[in-house]
């Protein structure tokens, strides 16, 4: 099939994304396989692009790296970044040394759009800012209160400012487009209440309640620390078909040793834990996260932060049922989540905190307003206009279009965001453990007996167990060394030798000290006694679930 234009200055619909994925797989059949891991509520495929070189060995015998995107419908920049990762790996194979090495030695599992139903709703006017996963039309899951609706018919969901003497807001004196908070004890002005645009179900004439949506927030639908009280958590863990398909993919590929889930927004690289402080985590694992995170910060400018410590304003209300806690706390996989794009930093606002729900002063709002008006035009800002609301009476509708400002960058900035974040993920992938048979010697002892000695080592940055929590949970498989003999027999020592775990370079960040982290072994020898009468061949295999499989063959006689 012909290759459509693949540009990284726009956001693609499901059909457009599917067309490009199929074209990339068709253009690179020796490296890429496109499959569907499941279907959404509305019957759309959840696509998986697997990238690797089968000529260099089976995929499950290589370290795997996993990327997913758009688990939340409105996070369109994430899907673009995952598509960029696919495009970058395929089009740079044979041209870029690092890409070629990674594709030859590892395998990539990339899910560019986990939530195709919600994404499709969010991409079309009126650009719903929260769509769940399409189980419900936005608002249909709410029993009463404010329902998102484009009541003025301009094609955008924005804000309603409602005159109210009890209101929390007032218009800025210097820029009436901006709403500033009413100060404690302030009286005597024109005040407003600010609501998302919509109508009110079962309105009592007084209150405008806003219910949390029930529709699936799939990043609260995973087994670890799952709670039904989390908004969008589903009826039980993995109740949502897309989340269940993701979980099956991860469980079916035990070679996955690194992960990144793309989100928007905030311009940060997130690490575990979602539910506990650093003091309750493995210090060695935290050091691992920080060192790999430094590489991400150098490439993207995004700081690496703990979700619990730095991204949870109320420690009594932690996020439960997240993908990252499941993959790290249960399986020990070094997992990151990147919040792409930071409007405020781009607009010149100094970073004060990592979580975005906090009051903005007038100066901050003015900087953001100026940037949005200059760079996003009517798609980012809707001028306030009078409207006679059927329930609230005279209101004004307008303001920031959050989905095309705070949640997603303008097209002219998108490609650089994609590029730098994908480069970080490739560095993370390259940190995988890599088990090799470094040497294989055969010493003749006479009478057809031979002593076979091999040295098995880990050439990677990460240990073969990946993390301390993997050992604590008893899920880290040991490195195995085995021998096969063609034309002879094994005389002494087991056919399969359990070598335990092999450390990576990460332990040795500074010269040895009795007060520092003590070093574990990165290599181990193994010996066998074999008998071969005449000519034969021996093959020694080093196998690690996370660090790959390597074989060395030697002829005897």
Positions of the model-derived regions?
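Short glycine- and acidic-rich boundary segments immediately preceding or forming the N-terminal edge
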Residues: 1-47, 416
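Soluble secreted/lumenal catalytic domains
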Residues: 22-26, 50, 237, 255
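Short helix-loop-beta-strand segments that form the rim/entrance of peptidase-like active sites
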Residues: 78-124
